């Protein structure tokens, strides 16, 4: 017999304005406001600092929105960006860079302790100096949202508000390379027409060897618009690429962009490929990776999550051979092309599912491993390490992470003695890849005990 259920009505929480004192920052740089009265929830609020007394508006069960700062912290600074209150990009400009770095180091320590990587009562972590970035104008890649306002006949270009689809129109971004927004602003008159803007998804601006504008389009642009873009590209010496649902093509005359390795090798890429946003700090990070791994001409290396070869090519310059393993086929192919174009015959590329990677996929064991996974981490590679015979495990492992929670989980897995993993941490540092934001980049180097 069919049974019919009447859906329960959801109780909408009524927003209240409350006063409270911030006790700490959580791992996402949100202020923690403990419940002052029984029945109230602990709230997590972006934009406030420890010790501050604030007025906030409740949202949902545990969130809140900062309304006013009644008693500011001495650590608070004047925010330099006029869009900071509404833009969803930066979320940490209200505290200086040194304290940003101190907070990020503390987050890593707390997570390492939580996952059992170390016990502060009996040991300490071998922290080295952080790799520090320029605090502003460091981004060489930005992605901008667009919306065509039909009634006003106007194209909005900007960043989205935090936790919102609303677009904040901007003319400049203080953390972006000045040339990026200059290119977009110069191109704006050609985009601000119904025939173009109504077909526009988003815009990506990149600057490595030369500026690149990637236009995401939902349908083909008319011939006169294409001609205008072609002329603009020539005059402004900026390459334009068009991306549709199933295709990515440069305009005629647009060259393939490239990044440059620490050895001067060219790393060609397509717009849309993964590229570290902070070019200056990326160079220092790769150099530190070489210093920590110490590859030699007698050694074989696995580079997992290799991308377009950011670590693979410098490793190949120093090691006997490198196997670059990447989950995205197109980028694995790009690594192969980059090795070939730079005259390297000791670098091979493999496209494989890194969640299910096995020793038989890789061939001969490697002396050194390099890992640079996305936020979900490298559980599949950790499982591979556990399954290897002790004599087939690498001498050193370098792990670069943009997510400290999955980093802590994976490092704990690599140190698991019950799995026969006899490693110790010999290097650890934060990498200032994303100043003015709560995002954390970390490098860890493990060495197998003799």
Swiss-Prot record:
TM region positions: none
Keyword Transferase recorded: yes
SUPFAM superfamilies the UniProt entry points to: S-adenosyl-L-methionine-dependent methyltransferases (SSF53335)
Keyword Transferase: yes
Annotated GO MF terms: 4 iron, 4 sulfur cluster binding; iron ion binding; RNA binding; rRNA (uridine-C5-)-methyltransferase activity
Keywords: 4Fe-4S, Iron, Iron-sulfur, Metal-binding, Methyltransferase, rRNA processing, S-adenosyl-L-methionine, Transferase
List of catalytic residues: 402 (nucleophile)
Catalysed reaction equations from the record: uridine(1939) in 23S rRNA + S-adenosyl-L-methionine = 5-methyluridine(1939) in 23S rRNA + S-adenosyl-L-homocysteine + H(+)
Function: Catalyzes the formation of 5-methyl-uridine at position 1939 (m5U1939) in 23S rRNA.
Protein name stated in the entry: 23S rRNA (uracil(1939)-C(5))-methyltransferase RlmD
Organismal lineage: Bacteria, Pseudomonadati, Pseudomonadota, Gammaproteobacteria, Alteromonadales
């Amino acid at each position: 017999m069919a049974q019919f259920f009447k859906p329960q009505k959801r109780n909408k929480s009524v927003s209240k304005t409350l006063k409270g004192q911030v006790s700490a920052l959580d791992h996402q740089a949100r202020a923690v406001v403990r419940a002052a009265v029984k029945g109230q929830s602990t709230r997590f609020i972006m934009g406030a600092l420890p010790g501050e007394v604030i007025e906030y508006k409740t949202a949902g069960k545990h969130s809140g929105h900062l309304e006013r700062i009644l008693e500011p912290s001495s650590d608070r600074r004047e925010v330099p960006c006029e869009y900071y209150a509404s833009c969803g990009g930066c979320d940490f400009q209200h505290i200086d860079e040194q304290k940003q770095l101190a907070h990020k180091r503390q987050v890593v320590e707390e997570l390492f302790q939580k996952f059992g990587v170390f016990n502060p009562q009996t040991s300490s972590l071998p922290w080295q100096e952080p790799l520090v970035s320029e605090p502003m104008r460091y981004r060489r890649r930005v992605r901008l949202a667009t919306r065509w306002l039909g009634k006003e006949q106007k194209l909005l270009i900007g960043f989205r508000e935090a936790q919102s689809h609303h677009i904040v129109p901007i003319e400049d971004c203080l953390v972006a390379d000045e040339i990026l927004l200059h290119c977009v602003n110069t191109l704006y008159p050609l985009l601000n027409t119904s025939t173009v803007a109504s077909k526009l998804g988003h815009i990506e601006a990149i600057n490595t060897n030369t500026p690149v504008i990637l236009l995401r389009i939902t349908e083909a642009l008319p011939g006169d618009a294409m001609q205008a873009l072609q002329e603009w590209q020539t005059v402004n010496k900026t390459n334009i690429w068009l991306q549709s649902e199933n295709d990515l093509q440069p305009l005629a005359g647009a060259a393939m962009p490239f990044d440059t390795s620490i050895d001067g090798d060219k790393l060609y890429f397509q717009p849309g490929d993964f590229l570290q946003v902070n070019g200056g700090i990326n160079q220092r990070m790769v150099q530190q990776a070489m210093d920590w791994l110490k590859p030699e001409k007698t050694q074989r290396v696995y580079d997992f999550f290799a991308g377009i070869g950011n670590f693979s090519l410098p490793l190949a310059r120093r090691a006997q051979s490198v196997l670059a393993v990447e989950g995205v086929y197109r980028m694995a192919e790009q690594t192969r092309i980059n090795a070939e174009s730079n005259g390297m015959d000791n670098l091979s590329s493999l496209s494989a599912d890194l969640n299910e990677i096995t020793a038989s996929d890789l061939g001969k064991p490697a002396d050194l491993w390099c890992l640079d996974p996305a936020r979900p981490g490298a559980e599949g590679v950790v499982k591979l390490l556990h399954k290897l015979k002790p004599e087939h495990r690498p001498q050193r492992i370098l792990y670069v992470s943009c997510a400290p929670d999955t980093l802590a989980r994976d490092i704990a897995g690599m140190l698991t003695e019950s799995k026969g993993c006899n490693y110790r941490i010999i290097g650890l540092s934060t990498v200032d890849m994303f100043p003015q934001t709560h995002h954390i980049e970390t490098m860890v180097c493990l060495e197998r005990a003799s």
